[in-house]
Amino acid sequence: MPTEIAPRDRLIVALDLPGVAEAEAMITRLGDAVTFYKIGMELTYAGGLGLAERLAADGKQVFMDLKLHDIPNTVERATRQIARLGARFLTVHGFSQSMTAALAGAAGSPLELLAVTVMTSYDDADLAAAGYAMGVKELVARRAVQAKQIGIHGLILSPEETQLVRPLVGPDMQLVTPGIRPAGSDVGDQKRIMTPALAIAGGADRLVVGRPVTGAADPAAAAESIVADIASALALVGKTNRT
């Protein structure tokens, strides 16, 4: 039976920083305010794999945002290596071969896979320029259904698409949303964004937040404010929670 996700565990702070020293300094500043961290490509290539392993050993949850997409054998073996770090989540692009291979690599481990539907920096015009005949919402829906059929654990998608996707995939797939900006924050390079409270109310399970926390004068206070927004939204909607 599913158990409750605490509001604090729903916030994933993106360590989009240039090096391990900067990331470790930020983790120290955040202290107990944050339990879940995302490590992306930039930090991974700067020594982030070791950091991920240390975070997991310290009891933090780790999301490796590597968006794997390669020949199946490479994806499977790379996923197996990530699983050995103790990470909780790993992203893979929402193509059937990559998703199937990643599942094989994660077999027998606690690692959960999140399929990337459409990058939150893309809009319909970007897809058209890349040769897609469908818009963002149609492509997100198609990839979400395929990911569920393959057995992927969750999805990465814009908060705008959570209400579209939830009826298609049911209650058990975790919906993890980047593009989260507290009211008044700079939108940066995201095109499909939403506030934390609205994202939770719309059906998101976990929220990825980077610069509004790591770029704040007081990162721990910024994180606590977002956690409070999440808790308030959960109370308002009476959300059924899952691990």
UniProtKB/Swiss-Prot annotation:
GO MF terms held by the record: orotidine-5'-phosphate decarboxylase activity
InterPro entries cross-referenced by the UniProt entry: Aldolase_TIM, OMPdecase, OMPdecase_AS, OMPdecase_bac, OMPdeCOase_dom, RibuloseP-bd_barrel
Pathway the protein acts in: Pyrimidine metabolism; UMP biosynthesis via de novo pathway; UMP from orotate: step 2/2
Annotated active site: 67
Record-listed substrate binding positions: 16, 38, 65-74, 120, 181, 190, 210-211
A single Gene Ontology CC term: cytosol
Keyword tags: Decarboxylase, Lyase, Pyrimidine biosynthesis
Pfam assignment, any one: OMPdecase
Gene3D superfamilies xref list: Aldolase class I (3.20.20.70)
Reactions it catalyzes: orotidine 5'-phosphate + H(+) = UMP + CO2
A biological process from GO: 'de novo' UMP biosynthetic process
EC number assigned by the record: 4.1.1.23
Function statement: Catalyzes the decarboxylation of orotidine 5'-monophosphate (OMP) to uridine 5'-monophosphate (UMP).
Family: Belongs to the OMP decarboxylase family. Type 1 subfamily.
Subunit organization: Homodimer.
Alphabetized PANTHER family for the sequence: OROTIDINE 5'-PHOSPHATE DECARBOXYLASE (PTHR32119:SF2)
Protein name: Orotidine 5'-phosphate decarboxylase
Taxonomic source organism: Bradyrhizobium sp. (strain BTAi1 / ATCC BAA-1182)
